[in-house]
């Protein structure tokens, strides 16, 4: 089955990033407790759904109540929270994941990574594909809780999708089946016209988009 209509999202780099990071870096086990930051984004929404397929309990964070609702009603997350309305990220994680975190799929870094490290379970895995909260900062956030990776024997691994292109045939076959069976659904954020591109780009860094941000060009 071909699904080229999704080549900008789940069939392209966002989907392969989610697939490679979750299956090859995080290496899930059935029953794992999974936390996904930027969960309503193009990568995060796929990670969450793959986690559910793998039999995991999944919690996501997002930047609005609308996105939180989408995670739970559209993408099947077990729980979610709006990080912008939380005064204590650690408390939010403890509330949603009282038994701790086995897998943290990190796209934001900074304070969220710091809070997640404290909640990680022994032998936990952190798959790091982005640090969007840190891009462009004059003074990047200094992560304070790295000591947790020693006492809890946490494996923290950064990865780039470029190292996993060899998985594409297998990924394509599996993902096409998930979409056909309704196990994976996708939401895109599409704006019309090249004139909308600058605002759409800026919106990426303030969390305005839901899913993959696309610009539709007339006649394309």
Model-derived regions: residue spans:
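N-terminal Rossmann NAD(P)H-binding glycine-rich loop of SDR-like oxidoreductase domains
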Residues: 40, 44, 48
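Hydrophobic/small residue at the entry helix of a nucleotide-binding pocket
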Residues: 14-17, 42-43, 111-112
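Adenosine-nucleotide cofactor-binding segment
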Residues: 52-115, 138, 162
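C-terminal capping/lid region of NAD(P)-dependent oxidoreductase domains
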Residues: 181-190, 198-220
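Glycine-rich helix-loop-beta junction characteristic of Rossmann-like nucleotide cofactor-binding loops
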Residues: 24-29, 50, 96-98
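Short acidic-hydrophobic, aromatic-tinged amphipathic segments that line or gate anion-handling sites
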Residues: 79-84, 189-196
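Glycine-rich phosphate-binding loop and adjacent beta-alpha segment
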Residues: 111-184, 217-220
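NAD(P)H dinucleotide-binding glycine-rich loop of Rossmann-like/cofactor-binding domains
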Residues: 1-38, 183
């Amino acid at each position: 089955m071909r699904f080229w209509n999704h080549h900008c999202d789940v069939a392209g780099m966002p989907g392969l990033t989610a697939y490679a990071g979750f299956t090859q870096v995080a290496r899930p086990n059935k029953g794992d407790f999974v936390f996904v930051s930027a969960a309503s984004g193009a990568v995060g929404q796929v990670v969450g759904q793959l986690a559910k397929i793998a039999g995991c309990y999944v919690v996501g964070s997002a930047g609005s109540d609308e996105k939180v609702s989408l995670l739970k009603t559209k993408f099947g997350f077990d729980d979610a929270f709006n990080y912008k309305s939380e005064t204590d990220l650690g408390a939010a994680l403890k509330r949603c994941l009282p038994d701790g975190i086995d897998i943290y799929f990190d796209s934001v870094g900074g304070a969220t990574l710091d809070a997640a490290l404290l909640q990680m379970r022994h032998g936990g895995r952190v798959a790091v594909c982005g640090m969007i909260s840190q891009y462009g900062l004059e003074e990047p956030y200094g992560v304070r809780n790295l000591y947790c990776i020693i006492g809890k024997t946490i494996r923290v691994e950064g990865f780039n999708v470029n190292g996993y292109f060899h998985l594409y045939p297998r990924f394509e076959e599996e993902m096409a089946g998930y979409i056909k069976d309704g196990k994976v659904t996708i939401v895109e954020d599409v704006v019309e016209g090249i004139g909308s591109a600058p605002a759409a780009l800026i919106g990426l860094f303030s969390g305005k988009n839901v899913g993959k941000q696309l610009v539709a060009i007339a006649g394309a």
